[in-house]
Amino acid sequence: MEVTAKLKGAPLSAQKGRLVADMIRNMNVSGALDVLKFTPKKGAKLMLKLLESAIANAENNNGADIDDLKVGMVCVDEATTLKRISPRAKGRANRICKRTCHITIKVSDEE
């Protein structure tokens, strides 16, 4: 059985999110939780909360045993970019792109 949790519009660039996603892909759930707790990145905190949500979904909706769960797919895709303007000298302006991403985590109890 495969259980999914999604976070849409996370305030994180997809490139930085993929660095964290690569660390926990194909790990068992308890190991992935430990890695995320001690990783000093903004994306780790977001993925920790999302992984805990996926574990709760598997436990409550499907009655899965937490010890058997593994992190299957971790997908970080680009979402909309918020465009902001920063004033510069002589009436000019620079564009600031605040990037967001969609994060999807699938946990499963199958090998």
Swiss-Prot record:
One of its GO terms (molecular function) is structural constituent of ribosome. Keywords: Ribonucleoprotein, Ribosomal protein, RNA-binding, rRNA-binding. GO terms for cellular component: cytosolic large ribosomal subunit. CDD domains: Ribosomal_L22. The keyword Repressor does not apply. It holds the Pfam family Ribosomal_L22. PROSITE patterns: RIBOSOMAL_L22 (PS00464). This protein binds specifically to 23S rRNA; its binding is stimulated by other ribosomal proteins, e.g. L4, L17, and L20. It is important during the early stages of 50S assembly. It makes multiple contacts with different domains of the 23S rRNA in the assembled 50S subunit and ribosome. The globular domain of the protein is located near the polypeptide exit tunnel on the outside of the subunit, while an extended beta-hairpin is found that lines the wall of the exit tunnel in the center of the 70S ribosome. NCBIfam families: rplV_bact. Part of the 50S ribosomal subunit. HAMAP family: Ribosomal_uL22_B (MF_01331_B). This is Large ribosomal subunit protein uL22. It comes from Legionella pneumophila (strain Corby). The lineage of its organism: Bacteria, Pseudomonadati, Pseudomonadota, Gammaproteobacteria, Legionellales.
